[in-house]
Amino acid sequence: MDKNRISAMLDGVDRYPFHMPGHKRNTALLGNEFPYDRDITEISGSDNLHDMSGVILEECNRASRLWGAVGAHILVNGSTCGILAAIRALAGHDRAVVVARNAHKSVYNGIELCRLRPTYLYPKMDAESGICGSITPGQVDAALSDAPDAKLVIVTSPTYEGVISDIAGIAAVAHARGASLLVDAAHGAHLGIGQMQAHPVTFGADIAICSLHKTLPAPTQTALALVGKTCPNSAAFAAQLAVFQTSSPSYILMEQSARCIHLLEQRGAELMAAWTERICAFEREVAHLTHLRLCFRGELPACAWAYDVGKLVISTRGTRLTGHALAELLRDEYKIEVEMAAGDYIIAMTSLADTDQGFSRLARALCEIDARTEADAERQGCFFPQLHAVDAPWQAADLPHLTVPTAQADGCVAAEYVWAYPPGIPLVVPGELVTGELLAALAQMQKSGTELHSTSGAMPQTLRVLED
């Protein structure tokens, strides 16, 4: 494979470094386990991530062409920095924002920083799996009608579980009402390559943020911001990236991002086709599961507009297994570690770097576990209630609060976030009313094996709530 421009530049660095970083590329002292020889700073012949004019700009232009965007930015602080920058550039301050309630916690951090008033979009839930479905254009239109001062709509597509929303329809509605569309596509970097579904940026997203490291062969923390042709202020977005992204970006991460882009440019269609075939072979191998179930295959539930087949969501509903128990069996007996376990399902994330052997190993394990699993129609599935927002998150964070036993928080207004990680989607947001139904759901999640976290770090024992 031909080298990308960043790799070629790093190969040519042969000057003694009287500059940062402090390791001075001294592999004789430090060893070769880490690529110190490629860890440079902004020296002559390199480039500046926040004022691109050379090799970094060339690789970003490659990414723009590959995904069909009008602009691209390599991100070394993960998708989080791109989301924060996009919110600050597009949403304004002290006004409404329309946001899917199943957004990542980085979105809520951006809402707090910009003192925005969220109008939430609640996706319908698939009754069989307990998984959130798509956001619809009709929901967005109604929300913008209720919040006419909103300048930004934020949706997640694909979701952590792989559910895709009608981005073209949502973009049309948002733009007709004078709002921009930010798509958190952190789990969709592979979309738009080969025969995979088109990427949100080609469907009308003004900015789409995708994590290269989640579904493509790139190291943790690498991500990409793709700018659409309708973005109202790409210069403001670039300026905000300089605020939320490090001023000392790692050339190691940027090089690996460029290598990933280069690989997709040269072999993307071939690799995506092979990946798709492996998924199809896996589906055939698990087609006769009796108790466990591979979700979102065949006819999709009404609540899902489309689905990313690269996500393998295996449901344990109707069995004596929880998702956590299934994950533990796979880990302990089959040496397979899945991405996430919830009360009623597991998520196995796949990518073009998976092998035939890896897929077959998972399929055999699931078939063996399924054969010895018993049905249990009595076991209740985990459903999460829709909550009522009394205050905006930033308002609740600024108000006097106290700490109470979680079981006694019914009727109080939350003053902190509660979430399960992964995926980092808040179950409770500051300013939301705590109900008995919510407390029962949290208790059920904990009983099933889900670890709950909170801003104070005291969940599940106590919860911060607003004073009366």
Regions found by a protein language model. Name each.
Residues 1-54:
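N-terminal "arm"/small-domain region of PLP-dependent enzymes with the aminotransferase-like
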Residues 451-468:
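Charge-dense polyanion-binding interfaces
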Residues 5-8, 29-30, 66-69, 79-298:
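Conserved PLP-enzyme active-site core in the AAT-like
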Residues 50-57, 80, 134-138, 161-164, ...:
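Electropositive phosphate-/nucleotide-binding environments in soluble metabolic enzymes
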Residues 35-79:
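Conserved N-terminal alpha-helix of the aminotransferase class I/II PLP-enzyme fold
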Residues 74, 120-122, 210, 340, ...:
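Structural signal for conserved beta-strand scaffold positions within catalytic alpha/beta enzyme cores
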Residues 46, 73-75, 153-156, 313, ...:
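Short glycine-rich or small-residue beta-strand-to-loop segments that form or flank ligand, phosphate
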Residues 284-454:
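Conserved C-terminal alpha-helix-loop-beta "cap" of PLP-dependent enzymes
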